């Protein structure tokens, strides 16, 4: 995509983010698309079991769970002078988080200030009597979300082909690039209409994360301008920044990388010390460095 922009004399770029993507997927559309991909009129028994488990899920808040198990809240744990052991580590927990412990708190209630209460284990709230969404992070979630978006993707690809542009989507992050002679607002309206047609009633664009960028040649260099404000603003997409000349990694992406790296090293050292073993650096290299042996 960045190469395509660089080769143009100028273009428009529209990036959008879908609000609460996994939480707002329509179960009826998902089932219909799943059947369509399989080429069947109804899901097989094993497929339907997976579908039902993903559309009738429950969840809990980890802090509420720790409170029910007798642990101090997050702020208290943070403010204590001495280090607090990891509450989820069985070997050092005051209460071992066994299945029996968890079963004992399943019916636990949390009372709100208005006198209402909620159970520890919750289910997604219904909207107009209907449940939406699938859990994020399950082995099937990414695949099913792509199956769900097939018609929307096809519609957007066809639109970009007609006007000589490019469409890309990664999960809930969407970017389209097209000739600068075409109005960005016009394309935005068409994407919004396509989402309404193929995405269901609850899947919406997050207006706070919409970016409209125009790449134009200023003197001899390609420059990115925010269409809304008229000031310089590089394109940001999937952790990268492109200003018309260079593709850079976003600073927040680097910060997150180093934070995870330091956390992994610290955890490996503590684990090795606790079990009186050596630190295995190969796994750290493989996950966070170019020093790992190529697969």
Regions picked out by a protein language model, each given a short descriptive name:
Residues 32-36, 195-197, 255-259:
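Short, low-complexity, polar/charged sequence segments that are solvent-exposed and flexible
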Residues 196-206:
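Flexible helix-coil linker/hinge segments at domain or subdomain boundaries
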Residues 8-171, 175-190, 232, 277:
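Conserved polymerase palm-domain catalytic core
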Residues 1-9:
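Well-ordered mid-protein domain cores that form the structural environment of catalytic cofactors
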Residues 42, 99-135, 147, 153-154, ...:
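Right-hand nucleic-acid polymerase module
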């Amino acid at each position: 995509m960045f190469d395509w922009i660089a080769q143009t004399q100028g273009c428009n770029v529209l990036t959008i983010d879908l609000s609460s993507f996994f939480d707002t997927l329509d179960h009826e559309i998902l089932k219909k698309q799943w059947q369509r991909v399989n080429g069947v009129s109804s899901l097989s028994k094993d497929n339907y079991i997976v579908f039902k488990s993903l559309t009738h899920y429950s969840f809990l808040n980890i802090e509420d769970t720790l409170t029910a198990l007798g642990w101090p809240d997050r702020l208290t744990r943070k403010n204590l002078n001495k280090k607090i052991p990891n509450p989820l580590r069985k070997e050092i927990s005051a209460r071992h988080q066994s299945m029996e412990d968890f079963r004992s708190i399943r019916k636990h209630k949390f009372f709100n200030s208005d006198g209402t209460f909620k159970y520890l284990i919750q289910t997604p709230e219904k909207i107009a009597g209907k449940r939406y969404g699938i859990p994020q992070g399950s082995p099937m979630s990414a695949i099913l979300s792509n199956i769900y978006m097939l018609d929307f993707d096809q519609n957007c690809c066809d639109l970009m082909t007609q006007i000589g542009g490019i469409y890309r989507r990664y999960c809930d992050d969407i970017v389209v690039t097209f000739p600068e002679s075409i109005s960005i607002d016009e394309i935005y309206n068409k994407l919004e209409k396509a989402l309404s047609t193929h995405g269901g009633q609850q899947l919406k664009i997050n207006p706070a994360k919409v970016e409209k960028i125009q790449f134009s040649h200023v003197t001899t260099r390609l420059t990115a301008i925010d269409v809304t404000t008229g000031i310089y603003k590089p394109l940001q997409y999937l952790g990268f920044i492109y200003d018309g000349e260079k593709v850079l990694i976003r600073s927040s992406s680097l910060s997150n990388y180093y934070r995870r790296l330091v956390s992994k090293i610290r955890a490996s050292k503590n684990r090795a010390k606790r079990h009186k073993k050596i630190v295995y650096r190969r796994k750290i290299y493989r996950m966070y460095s170019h020093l790992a042996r190529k697969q």
